From Swiss-Prot:
It comes from Aspergillus fumigatus (strain ATCC MYA-4609 / CBS 101355 / FGSC A1100 / Af293). GO terms for molecular function: GTP binding; GTPase activity; translation elongation factor activity. This is Elongation factor G, mitochondrial. Disulfide bonds: none annotated. Transmembrane segments: none annotated. It is found in: Mitochondrion. The keyword GTP-binding applies. One of its GO terms (cellular component) is mitochondrion. Keywords: Elongation factor, GTP-binding, Mitochondrion, Nucleotide-binding, Protein biosynthesis, Transit peptide.
Length: 802
């Protein structure tokens, strides 16, 4: 074992990290040494030597406990001074081996890039499943990770699915080593982006899949942004090398230019399209082929085919040059004009990948069962194990100061619930264990509400199947039954006041009214609504008191359609829906000053509150701001708190069309109170009234959501597609033309995109596809604003007539 990196630990923690010579030797070695010495002695001396072993073992345990305690103190008191190397170096040897053989990875990509097909091959080659089945359920079985009937019918992944498998990798010395992989397959469609968000929040690494024909696509850019948000290292896999028009090096170039990540191929394909045979490994300089009915046999040859030798030499040179830009050791060798060894290249790629400076690019075809196993080797070689990733929590006992989580089983337990699912046995909660051990029957505490819950069952998930286990260690992913919580909740064993940041949840952009067709289905309807909200943070349910309608909101038409269909299938509730409604927003126009007095007297205690100040735009169409600039205490602290509450309530429902307010700032700098009639309610109401009056005097505007759109279709339909976008007042930003197809990138209002998929299919003979995601809010056209305001005023008038 290497010497612990004590120099990297803060001084205050060093006292507990004194190296013991016993710690450097394994228990087995000590036992063998004592036993072998005892064999030369008389039998009477045996117990004495046995006691020596126990004494050494006790010393080792005590030293290990002291080291662990010191690391924990350093993690809490000075997380910036505690390096991951120090955490790794001071791991218990058995723990170090376990974590070094563990990978938590996700597979993410643009829709239809082959994520689920690739995952199916991974499960087959690791022995997790016995036969390969295809997406869309064409063989009446369907891919293992698409367990929902809807997924198999539509050929898309709707929910992220977790599994685990073991990959046996041959080391450089020819020895086989078993690695444990926790794998999450994610959806590619933007409507289900929350599934990607919560998967990447808890994973240590990812495989980003690209199509060899299309390269970097719109959703690839979204996935890249999500990976950056959570600092997830990735390797890239250029899939579909057997497709017509495959050009893997275009994909490599686009990773560099579009995603702005230094990338280089670590493989060169042998042939392409229908002549794709295998790949050349640029690090080992060997050819790799697949043999057998399903490509299960990997054949490695020393000979590199003559037809690709020049490309191999050029791409290896480019790999070394790219690494020299991101890794100091390779840079030194490059300047010295020294050829790096295989081990030096691998180490550099690993360092740069984990450091988020580089992504190695692999190539293959999952559908053709070619070159998937080398990609799995890349997962092991270049993606981090849990001990190599920095994970932080907030200590609520110390004003939410940052603390570093240490993946030792011996530490107090900390875990994050990242996904909820309803099953036949109750709520299933997916948990990533960051620190300590989660045991069956143990009590854990929810950091959000400090509620104690018992863990009755722990399981490992394999898509929709499960295996029961008694405990889960640090760095692992599992699911538990019977734990009532929300997605994003932190659990601890009660010793620590830690909480972790949840995943990013985007705001819904589309709504529609919904009700059950038959009133007798109301109970099941309510049950379904409650479940779907609990499972999916981007699916919202609200009740509009004015129209007396239930509204569901989500990320797009497909998102809501899927839930309506699930309600029909899973709860046998047929629903009636209204037309889609856009999530408009309102914003202030100009700065407006206000001086508002609320004064009521009706026999009993009255109401009195005066608020003075101004409202103005914040400068960005984002969050609202409330400030108090009271001098002299004209309004007390508790009444100012009520003012802020009134401001926030007013922003929830704007005066213009009844939608949320954005980009508005309110400042209160004076006011007055009454000795007996002033109350928190008075100031809350006064602030709301002042807000509405000032807002309407400011020349306010209605904002509409703008969407980023990418439309891909065969080249002969380019004119029709652009005409279609122009009719919707879309702003075309860029056009890319490929061999057989083109892609148009545009911005368009969500209001203009309703029904677009139907018109696109008609214009392209069913061959076009598009993706869209929320971009930003901007002012709606004056005519649309006028129509929306008139509609709102009419609805208000009709309501008052009732």
């Amino acid at each position: 074992m290497r010497c612990p990196s004590l120099a990297r630990l803060p001084n205050r923690a060093l006292s507990g990290l004194t190296r013991s010579p016993v710690r450097l030797q394994s228990q087995n070695f000590l036992y063998q040494r004592c036993a072998s010495t005892a064999a030369l002695r008389s039998p009477i001396a045996g117990p004495a030597y046995q006691s020596v072993f126990h004494r050494h073992n006790l010393q080792r345990r005590n030293a290990s406990a002291a080291t662990t305690a010191a690391v924990l103190e350093a993690a809490a008191s000075n997380p910036d001074g505690l390096s991951q190397e120090a955490i790794i170096d001071n791991l218990d040897p058995a723990e170090a081996i376990r974590l070094s053989r563990l990978r938590n990875i996700g597979i993410a990509a643009h829709i239809d890039s082959g994520k689920t097909t690739c995952t199916e091959r991974v499960l087959f080659y690791t022995g997790r499943i016995k036969a390969i089945h295809e997406v869309r359920g064409r063989d009446n079985v369907g891919a293992k990770m698409d367990s929902m009937d809807l997924e198999r019918e539509k050929g898309i992944t709707i929910q992220s699915a977790a599994t685990f498998c073991d990959w046996i990798k041959k080391g450089d010395d020819g020895k086989e080593e078993k690695y444990h992989i926790n794998l999450i397959d994610t959806p590619g469609h933007i409507d289900f982006t929350i599934e990607v968000e919560r998967a990447l929040r808890v994973l240590d690494g990812a495989v980003m899949i690209l199509c060899a024909v299309s390269g970097v696509q719109s959703q690839t850019i979204t996935v890249d942004r999500q990976m950056r948000r959570y600092n997830v290292p990735r390797i890239s896999f250029v899939n579909k090398m057997d497709r017509m028009g495959a050009n893997p090096f275009k994909a490599v170039e686009q990773i560099n230019t579009k995603l702005k990540i230094p990338a280089a191929a670590v493989q060169v394909p042998i042939g392409a399209e229908d002549e794709f045979e295998g790949v050349v490994d640029l690090i080992r300089m060997k050819s790799i082929y697949n043999d057998g009915p399903n490509g299960e046999t990997v054949v490695v040859k020393d000979e590199i085919p003559e037809k690709v030798k020049s490309v191999v030499e050029e791409r290896r040179r480019m790999l070394i040059e790219t690494l020299a830009d991101v890794d100091d050791e390779i840079a030194e060798l490059f300047l010295e004009e020294t050829e790096p060894t295989e081990q030096q290249l691998k180490a550099a790629i690993r360092r740069a990948t984990i450091g988020l400076k580089f992504t190695p690019v692999f190539m293959g075809s999952a559908l053709a069962n070619k070159s998937v196993q080398p990609m799995l080797d890349g997962v092991i070689d270049y993606l981090p194990n849990p001990s190599e990733v920095e994970n932080l929590a907030l200590d609520r006992k110390r004003d939410e100061a940052s603390v570093k989580l240490v993946p030792y089983n011996s530490q107090p337990f900390v875990g994050l619930a990242f996904k909820l699912e309803e099953s036949n046995f109750g709520q299933l909660t997916y948990i990533r264990v960051y620190q300590g051990t989660l045991r069956k029957g143990a009590n854990v505490f929810n950091a959000r509400n400090n509620k104690k819950v018992k863990v009755p069952r722990i399981v490992r998930m394999h898509s929709n199947e499960m295996e029961e286990v008694s405990e889960i260690g640090a760095g692992e992913i599992c699911a538990v039954f019977g734990v009532d919580c929300a997605s994003g909740d932190t659990f601890t064993d009660g010793q620590l006041g830690y909480t972790m940041t949840s995943m990013f949840v985007p705001e819904p952009v589309i709504s529609l009214s919904i009700k059950p067709k038959n009133s007798k289905d109301s109970a099941n309807f309510s049950k379904a609504m409650a479940r779907f909200q609990r499972e999916d943070p981007t699916f919202r349910v609200s009740y509009n008191a004015e129209s007396e309608e239930t509204l569901i909101s989500g990320m797009g038409e497909l998102h809501l359609d899927i839930y309506i269909e699930r309600m029909r299938r899973e709860y046998r509730v047929d629903c009636v829906t209204g037309p889609p409604q856009v999530a408009y927003r309102e914003t202030i126009g100009n700065r407006v000053e206000f001086d508002h007095l609320l004064k009521k007297q009706s026999g009993g205690p009255g109401e009195y509150a005066r608020v003075v100040g101004w409202m103005e735009p914040t400068g960005k169409l984002e969050d609202n701001k409330f400030e108090e600039q009271i001098v002299g205490g004209s309004i007390s602290e508790k009444f100012l708190f009520a003012c802020e509450k009134g401001f926030n309530l007013a922003c929830e429902k704007g005066p213009l069309i009844g939608h949320k307010v954005l980009g508005t700032k309110m400042v209160i700098n004076d006011g007055a109170t009454h000795m007996t009639d002033s109350s928190e309610m008075s100031f809350k109401n006064a602030t709301q009234q002042a807000f509405r009056k000032a807002f309407m005097e400011s020349n306010p505007s209605v904002l509409e959501p703008m969407m980023k759109i990418a439309v891909t279709a065969p080249g002969e339909f380019q004119g029709d597609v652009i005409s279609l976008l122009n009719k919707r007042n879309a702003t075309i930003n860029d056009t890319e033309t490929g061999v057989d197809e083109f892609t148009v990138y545009a911005d368009c209002s969500l209001n203009g995109m309703f029904g677009f998929s139907t018109h696109l299919r008609a214009a392209t003979q069913g061959k076009g596809e598009f993706t869209m995601e929320f971009s930003h809010y901007e002012k709606a056209q004056p005519q649309l604003q006028k129509e929306l305001i008139q509609k709102y005023l009419k609805a208000q008038a009709d309501r008052h007539k009732k």
